[in-house]
């Protein structure tokens, strides 16, 4: 993801000094800057995915035989992670397709995911099931991922508010 993230900043920086760069990409500077912002958020999402993957072993090693509170918390966390994945996917699609409706829906889902994550965090603190520490670390990354998805949706909305740029004004 880090290598892919370098592409939008490189093009954006070149576009500041080279007008042909913008023409070659067939986008205007504001659009290019939005792509840069989205790429930056996706890079952060990828960082959280790596962290979640690294912590997954700790979560799995904390599970025991039989149904426990930890299993219930893990199921809630898995559902939250799926909802967060949908937020990111919807927000990214909204940014690429300039869809305000999708961006607003992604923001609504983002807010719900963050609220659900905070509620689960409180429940983990109160119940303190086995493996709660590892679960809370994964939960933190899942919530931050949802927030990054919300940031992508905000970029999509901001891009939709711009007036079209006429030829020669890029």
Functional labels for PLM-detected ranges:
Residues 1-170:
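Cytosolic, long alpha-helical scaffolding segments
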């Amino acid at each position: 993801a880090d290598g892919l993230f370098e592409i939008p900043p490189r093009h954006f920086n070149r576009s500041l000094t080279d007008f042909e760069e913008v023409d070659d990409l067939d986008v205007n500077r504001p659009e290019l800057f939005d792509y840069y912002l989205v790429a930056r958020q996706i890079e952060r999402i990828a960082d959280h995915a790596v962290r979640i993957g690294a912590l997954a072993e700790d979560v799995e090693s904390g599970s025991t035989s039989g149904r426990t509170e930890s299993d219930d918390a893990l199921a809630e966390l898995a559902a939250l992670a799926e909802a967060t994945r949908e937020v990111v996917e919807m927000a990214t699609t909204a940014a690429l397709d300039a869809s305000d409706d999708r961006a607003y829906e992604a923001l609504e889902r983002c807010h719900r995911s963050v609220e659900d994550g905070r509620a689960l965090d409180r429940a983990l603190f109160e119940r303190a099931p086995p493996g709660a520490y590892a679960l809370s670390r994964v939960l933190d990354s899942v919530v931050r991922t949802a927030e990054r998805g919300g940031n992508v949706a905000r970029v999509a909305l901001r891009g939709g508010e711009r007036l079209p740029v006429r030829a020669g004004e890029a």
